[in-house]
Amino acid sequence: MASEPGGLVEIWTDGGCKPNPGAGGWAAVLRFGAAEREMSGAERETTNNRMELTAAAAALEALKRPCRVKLHTDSEYLRNGITRWHTGWVRRNWRNAQGDPVANYELWQRVLAAAKPHEIEWIWVRGHAGDPMNERVDQLATAAREAMLREPAETSTARR
C-alpha cells in the first residue's frame, strides 16, 4: 500500500487457531485516508501467537515507503514483545529472561525488520469486545483458516 511521506496508515491485525496449536488464520486491514486493503492467510499447523506475528509482519511489509502507523492488535504477546521485551531478547542474544531461546524467533525478526522504517504506535484493543475493526479482522482470519481447511492438505494460503 503506497502512502505519502509522513502520512498516517492505520492497521488492524488478528490471528488465531482452532485448536491452538492447530489450523490457524491471520488477517490485516490497512487504511490510508479513504483507501483500504485487506490481507489474510492461513497455515495448517501453527499457533495463535505465530498467526498474530504473521499478520503484523505482512501488514507492515505491504507498506511501500516509511510511514506513521497506528497498529491495532488484541494480542498482548505482540504488543508487549515489541514495546517491552525485544530489547532484552536482543541484549541476551535472543534468549528470554529464563535463558531459553525466544519462541517464534524468526517471526519476531520479520516483524522487527518490517517495523524498522516506520514510526509505529502499537495500540492494544480488547478482543471480542465489540470494536468493529477488531471484529472485522477476526472474521477475516477465521474465514482464511476455514477456506484453507477446505483445500488439499499440502497447501497453506496467503491472500494479499
Swiss-Prot record:
Listed binding positions for Mg(2+) 2 are D14, D138
What is the annotated localization of this protein?
A: Cytoplasm
Q: Which domain of life is it from?
A: Bacteria
Q: What is its EC number?
A: 3.1.26.4
- PANTHER family (alphabetical): RIBONUCLEASE H1
Where is it mainly found? cytoplasm
Tell me the keywords, alphabetical order: Cytoplasm, Endonuclease, Hydrolase, Magnesium, Metal-binding, Nuclease
Stored InterPro entries: RNase_H, RNaseH-like_sf, RNaseH_domain, RNaseH_sf, RNaseHI
Q: Required cofactors, per record?
A: Mg(2+)
Its annotated function is as follows: Endonuclease that specifically degrades the RNA of RNA-DNA hybrids.
UniProt xrefs under Gene3D superfamilies: Ribonuclease H-like superfamily/Ribonuclease H
Q: What is this protein called?
A: Ribonuclease H
Q: Name one GO cellular component term.
A: cytoplasm
Under the heading NCBIfam families, the entry gives: PRK00203.1
RNase H type-1 domain sequence ranges: 5-146
| Catalytic activity as recorded in UniProt | Endonucleolytic cleavage to 5'-phosphomonoester
The record's note on quaternary structure and interaction partners says:
Monomer.
Task: Give binding positions for Mg(2+) 1.
Answer: D14, E52, D74
User: How is its cofactor bound, per UniProt?
Assistant: Binds 1 Mg(2+) ion per subunit. May bind a second metal ion at a regulatory site, or after substrate binding.
